[in-house]
């Protein structure tokens, strides 16, 4: 949101914006990078790629959430979109049990943080932000901000 001031302002100023914003932020910046690894039980072809039986496969959750067949303009953050059906926190029997808590925390924390610090901004260029190297769970090493 700090890179999109117009959308940050909407979340800060419009109580109805937070619900769709949470879903869009989860879709756009998926925290968990892959689904539970699976082993193919039969030969299968996916998008023209042959995968033999017995191979370990990983499903990329961010790739699914950025699929243009799933959402229009997938690389554009649009907090009004809402992005229902994203895979950011699993799906079906593999949906995270903590999902309702995570959504509630974001529903409370984002508006409160943005009201308390209305001038919240990045303190360094976004390209200088350091990311964690562990690739299963996505995140920042740190985030310098000003207010």
Where are these regions (language model features)?
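Cytochrome P450
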Residues: 1-147
């Amino acid at each position: 949101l700090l890179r999109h001031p117009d959308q940050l302002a909407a979340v800060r100023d419009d109580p109805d914006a937070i619900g769709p914003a949470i879903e869009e932020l989860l879709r756009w910046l998926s925290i968990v990078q892959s689904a539970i690894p699976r082993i193919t039980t039969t030969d299968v072809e996916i998008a023209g790629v042959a995968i033999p039986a017995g191979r370990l496969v990983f499903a990329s959750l961010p790739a699914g959430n950025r699929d243009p067949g799933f959402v229009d303009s997938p690389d554009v953050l649009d907090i009004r979109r809402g992005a229902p059906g994203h895979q950011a926190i699993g799906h079906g029997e593999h949906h995270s049990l903590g999902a309702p808590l995570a959504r509630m925390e974001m529903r409370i924390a984002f508006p409160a943080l943005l009201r308390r610090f209305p001038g919240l901004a990045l303190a360094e260029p976004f390209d200088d932000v350091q990311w964690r190297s562990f690739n299963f769970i996505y995140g920042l090493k740190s985030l310098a901000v000003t207010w």
